[in-house]
């Protein structure tokens, strides 16, 4: 593939990325992981708004379905050692271009979240890295996954009237990764932690239970799911261990279990950015690491084997957004 890099702005510790429809136009959000702003860009890469100047600590953002310009975001998750005050906020623009930021729900240690739809109902699913913290690198308190039906109108929610969450699963140490996907026409999500890779599927109706299925028992920081080799079966692309250095792909064997079929030949310190999908007409697995050689790598199935291509070095991508002009 041929690549062209375009620097559109500067943002200290740029971290979170998300698409946003704003005033009917296709845009994207960029926010910082520390005490820095959030910016909104149009398709051309021109900065058109600053939804907030702080407080930062933004791990995830996602547009509220069917609401122009309105989106949810995490605030005040600054690191695994500084995220007790983390929460999910609602950010809403007005006609004059000002942005209102209100609390949707306090969620200590919330790192990732997503909005999934099934049978016309939207569900908020949130993933908390841990459940308690008393000193640096304290991992005694595993995280968990929580959910709620997301109402169509969020106007009544604020710090004093928060969305009620239900615990779906606990005991998830270093609950770091989240990846929304669609399997057999149903929106669902991969969630990864030291206990492995889990698939969460919303219920057919709010009165029913979520389906939770463990796909793999290998400790994982992040995962994606995609039919990389076009054999009709979904492979798992994995970053092994929390902020680990092993990049691998797992395939389904004849017994219906995932087994490793490929591993990148060198260690990549602090693997973090991860994405999978169709890029330039081919299924690709794109990843980046934040320390050491700080590569961005594309993996694809070519001539009966997995081949890799280095997109960039010495950059340290934190996350990846596949953004196509409409």
Segments from the language model and where they lie:
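Beta-propeller-forming repeat regions
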Residues: 1-326
């Amino acid at each position: 593939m041929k690549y062209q890099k375009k620097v559109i702005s500067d943002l200290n510790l740029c971290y979170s990325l998300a698409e946003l429809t704003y005033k009917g136009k296709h845009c994207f959000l960029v926010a910082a992981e520390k005490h820095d702003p959030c910016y909104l860009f149009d398709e051309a890469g021109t900065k058109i708004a600053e939804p907030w100047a702080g407080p930062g600590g933004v791990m995830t953002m996602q547009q509220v379905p069917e609401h122009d310009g309105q989106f949810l975001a995490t605030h005040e998750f600054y690191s695994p050692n500084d995220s007790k005050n983390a929460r999910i906020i609602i950010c809403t623009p007005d006609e004059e271009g000002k942005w209102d930021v209100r609390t949707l729900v306090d969620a200590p240690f919330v790192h990732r979240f997503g909005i999934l739809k099934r049978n016309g109902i939207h569900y908020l699913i949130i993933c908390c890295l841990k459940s308690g913290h008393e000193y640096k690198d304290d991992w005694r308190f595993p995280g968990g996954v929580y959910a709620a039906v997301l109402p169509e109108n969020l106007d009544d929610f604020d710090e004093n009237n928060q969305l009620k969450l239900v615990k779906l699963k606990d005991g998830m140490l270093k609950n770091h990764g989240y990846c929304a996907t669609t399997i057999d026409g149903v929106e669902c999500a991969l969630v990864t932690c030291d206990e492995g890779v889990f698939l969460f599927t919303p219920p057919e109706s709010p009165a029913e239970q979520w389906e939770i299925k463990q796909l793999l028992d290998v400790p994982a920081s992040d995962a994606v799911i995609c039919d990389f080799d076009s054999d009709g079966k979904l492979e798992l692309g994995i970053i092994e261990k929390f902020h680990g250095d092993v990049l691998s792909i797992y395939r389904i064997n004849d017994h219906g279990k995932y087994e490793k079929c490929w591993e990148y030949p060198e260690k990549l310190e602090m693997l973090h950015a991860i994405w999978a999908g169709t890029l330039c007409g081919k299924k690709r697995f794109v990843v980046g690491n934040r320390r050491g050689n700080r590569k961005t790598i594309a993996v694809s199935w070519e001539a009966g084997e997995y081949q890799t291509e280095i997109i960039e070095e010495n950059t340290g991508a934190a996350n990846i957004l596949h953004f196509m002009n409409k």
